[in-house]
């Protein structure tokens, strides 16, 4: 069944999530498509700037002991980085849900100028249409 929206945003990065939330708060029916739930919030939050800077900060704090101590410290630092990215990812997701955006997991492909096909993780297909389609990848 074809789901109808005013706007469909493809990609959950900084610009896409911000625009989707703003449009939804203005009363538009908005869908945001992201192929991987582990990338909610985009590259910066999940694998770019923020986790990299967190690991650099932890490396600067690391005790200058033997390899075994440093190895354990590294393990803890990576776990803390994962906690941070998970918390940020969920905060971004919740902001969109609270704004009224429908978040859809899957890979988007254009079927025509106003229609998107979304293939889910288990091979399911959805068809979405909107007058405005925004690529944010």
Where does each model-flagged region fall?
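Beta1/beta-strand and adjacent pyrophosphate-binding region of the FAD-binding site
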Residues: 1-13
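Glycine-rich flavin
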Residues: 2-5, 22-28, 34-137
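The conserved SAM/SAH-binding core of class I Rossmann-like methyltransferase domains
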Residues: 10, 33-34
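N-terminal Rossmann-fold NAD(P) dinucleotide-binding loop
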Residues: 16-17
